[in-house]
Amino acid sequence: FRSNGTRLRSEILMRVRNALTHLLRNAIAHGIEGHEERRAAGKTLDGRISVEIKEVEDQILVVCEDDGRGIDPEELARAAVSKGILSEEDARRKAAEEGAAMIFLSGLSTAQTITQTAGRGVGMEAVEAEIHAAGGRVLVETERGRYTRFTLRLPRK
């Protein structure tokens, strides 16, 4: 965890805390691979998750990144179709146009089973809702087999 001394208003802090809880759970449940998969990918056996909070001009950025398997838009599309969230045509189009941002679709999860930390398809939608309610936005960047990075951009005001 890194911060350059950035202070957050209590309202923003609560929203960031809730969003970070979901992001960290997702990184653990979906992102960081097991030892065998990491070994096969040439990675260190221990996964890495970092959180950085910084001020940039009139915004506060909260960056949460893992060195896991990344997000597969095609897998998201298949899950959206199998759960009846999208038609096959809409899922293909969204995967091509939105890529990993499909992760914010309501009810979407790629988890095979429901656990205490994954599988209900509400966490990432909640992240987006929390940050939007604070006047911010969520950006997602990913590369299959390498990393996923979420950037929460919040107004400093």
Where are these regions (language model features)?
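Conserved glycine-centered short motifs in functionally critical loops
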Residues: R2-K157
